[in-house]
């Protein structure tokens, strides 16, 4: 006597009695795998294209001289990567190269091309940061791109403040941040100035090499700002004075 299946008499047994359950499971898994492959392919294709820009990105980040043909090929690869998978990370990566190439003085390109690269970088950064706002480096890049395109402004300050709020203790970002702060000081509100002064003072306190503070000074007003930020600490004032004197000897 054949044992009754445990599911018999409950509907599913009658409906599927002629279909082996293993086949059904394989069919479902096959559909799932095909769907997963369909969804994953743009990500994989985008990653493959993005990898083609790795060498140029490394050269940019290590401040090596960029070569125009390599930059153009890398940008084309990143364009394809964004087209295949237009997520925040892809566009932020492309923005980094666009901005770096636009501001690379050694590249033999026109000012019109540099401006076009910067505008595309601005668009990528704004898209990327809208979708992934916790990126202090990208906010600093947006601040510098806006200043390069439009000059000093409140829009530069807005991006700069977001950079500080999202990555306040990232020391490698502070030299360019300080330069942007000094350039755009008149666009900060009174409340924002108090916050910035506190951040600069804290960064001074935590820094082991403070030469970059003096290197950022280009006008007497810049020097006054730094002296104000360091407050009444006589040791800090004396050290800053020595750093300024050494910077002037260069």
Question: Where are the regions that the model predicts?
Answer:
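Polar low-complexity intrinsically disordered regions
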Residues: 3-5, 65, 246-250
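Alpha-helical repeat scaffolds
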Residues: 33-39, 71-81, 113-127, 154-164, ...
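Hydrophobic membrane-insertion alpha-helices, especially the h-region
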Residues: 22-43
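Amphipathic alpha-helical repeat scaffolds of TPR domains
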Residues: 44-62, 83-108, 132-145, 171-183, ...
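Terminal alpha-helical segments
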Residues: 41, 61-77, 172
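N-terminal Lys/Arg-rich, disordered targeting/topogenic segments
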Residues: 1-16
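Terminal, low-structured helical/coil segments at or just beyond the last alpha-helical repeat
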Residues: 184-250
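Non-cytosolic head/periplasmic domains of membrane-anchored proteins
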Residues: 109-182, 188
């Amino acid at each position: 006597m054949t044992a009754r299946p445990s599911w018999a008499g409950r509907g599913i047994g009658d409906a599927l009695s002629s279909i082996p359950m293993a086949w059904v499971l394989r069919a479902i898994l096959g559909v799932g795998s095909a769907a997963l492959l369909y969804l994953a392919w743009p990500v994989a294709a985008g990653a493959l294209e993005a990898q083609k820009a790795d060498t140029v990105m490394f050269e940019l980040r290590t401040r090596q001289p960029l070569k125009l043909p390599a930059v153009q090929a890398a940008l084309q690869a990143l364009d394809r990567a964004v087209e295949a998978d237009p997520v925040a990370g892809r566009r932020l990566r492309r923005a980094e190269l666009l901005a770096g190439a636009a501001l690379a003085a050694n590249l033999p390109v026109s000012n019109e091309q540099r401006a076009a690269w910067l505008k595309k970088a601005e668009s990528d950064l704004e898209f990327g940061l809208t979708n992934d706002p916790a990126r202090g480096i990208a906010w600093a890049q947006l601040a510098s791109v806006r200043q390069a395109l439009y000059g000093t402004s409140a829009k530069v300050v807005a991006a700069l403040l977001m950079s500080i709020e999202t990555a306040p203790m990232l020391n490698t970002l502070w030299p360019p941040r300080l330069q942007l702060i000094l350039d755009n000081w008149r666009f900060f509100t009174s409340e924002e100035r108090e916050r910035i002064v506190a951040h600069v003072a804290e960064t001074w306190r935590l820094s082991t090499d403070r030469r970059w503070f003096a290197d950022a000074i280009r006008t007497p007003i810049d020097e006054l700002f730094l002296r104000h930020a360091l407050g009444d600490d006589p040791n800090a004032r004396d050290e800053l004075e020595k750093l300024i004197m050494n910077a002037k000897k260069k």
